[in-house]
Design a protein with these regions (language model features):
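Histidine-anchored nucleotide/phosphate-binding helix
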Residues: 157-173
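Structural recognition of the conserved hydrophobic beta-strand(s) that form the central parallel beta-sheet
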Residues: 150-151, 174-179
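Conserved P-loop NTPase "ATPase switch" module shared by AAA+ and STAND
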Residues: 145-158
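Basic/charged alpha-beta structural segments of nucleotide/phosphate-handling enzymes
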Residues: 2-144, 159, 166, 180-186
Length: 187
């Protein structure tokens, strides 16, 4: 046999935007671009810096550190497929004063942040990735590809990745290779 003529496309599931043209196709054209992560941290840090915790002003380094934590929380809510709607409601009104500070932080990312992102015509990177993967699932369910699709090494820990794995398993040439399974002899 001869030499291979073309290498397979092997994108990483975490970098959905990186392989848009060949894999995701036109689904991403309707979505706003992902906001730069550093810009998001800096915008949130500015919002946080105007706050006080326990009556003390938040310093710029503290604001940046807290903005990173808020971004992580925002990403985790998006990755889980959950909604932030009820998160602030878990804090009872009759708890200690410091819970009010926590509620202020939650208000920044769940009430003020969506408006800021909309004004800038961008969306959170994790949310965009989840929507792109969902669009790819819809596309493959309606028009299964004629070529093999293999997902290797993913545990499906994120809801969007799990949905993609289920879609790939239903494809005529879809395969999932789970990480860490011992080699088993065929009999």
């Amino acid at each position: 046999a001869g030499q291979p003529l073309m290498l397979p496309a092997m994108p990483a599931l975490g970098d959905v935007d990186e392989f848009l043209p060949g894999i995701i196709g036109a689904q991403g054209d309707d979505l706003p671009p992902a906001m730069d992560r550093v810009e998001r941290h800096l915008i949130l840090a500015r919002l946080i810096q105007g706050m006080t915790i326990g009556g003390r002003a938040i310093s710029p380094p503290q604001a940046l550190s807290l903005s990173i934590s808020l971004c992580t929380l925002l990403d985790q809510v998006s990755q889980s497929g959950g909604s932030p709607d009820g998160l602030a409601d878990i804090i009872p009104d009759d708890f200690a004063h410091h819970w009010g500070d926590i509620r202020q932080f939650l208000d920044i990312i769940f009430q003020r942040w969506p408006d800021i992102a909309a004004q800038k015509h961008v969306m959170d990177p994790v949310q965009r990735s989840a929507l792109l993967l969902s669009a790819q699932c819809d596309e493959w369910q309606q028009n299964p590809p004629a070529h093999p699709v293999i997902i290797a090494g993913s545990t499906g820990s994120l809801s969007s990745t799990r949905a993609l794995m289920k879609t790939v398993m239903a494809l005529p040439q879809g395969f999932i290779v789970l990480p860490g399974l011992p080699e088993m002899p065929f009999s």
